[in-house]
Amino acid sequence: MSLTIEKITLACTNISKMPEFYSKVFKADLKEHNFGDFKMYSAKLGNLRFLFCPNEIAGVDANQSRHQFDYIVENVNEVIEAGLASGGSIHSELQENDSELFVTLLDPDGNTINFIEKK
């Protein structure tokens, strides 16, 4: 059996804050979509399609950490600056070992995201 992830949908509490964060941190070109009275946003991050939709549409009752992904980046300090400048915060401080630098940020909804810079 072959399995490929085509799209990830993130249910968001603070949907209005998500575009700025993901545009700056991931350099994603988010597109706005209207679904009745709701706004949703979609983008391609790497080879994966993402859809950000309000909790009300998704019917999700979780308050934070509905997902966690690890991303390999070229410059982790650049990602930290972009995240802090666009509504994110640091969950765990920048750490370093022999092979990588890594940090965990929180997006505006409080979801943890790990960023890793390989040495």
Regions found by a protein language model. Give the residues of each.
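Core segments of cupin and vicinal oxygen chelate
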Residues: 2, 9-50
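Short, charged/polar, Gly/Pro-enriched secondary-structure boundary elements
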Residues: 47-51, 109-112
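Vicinal oxygen chelate
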Residues: 1-13, 42-44, 59-119
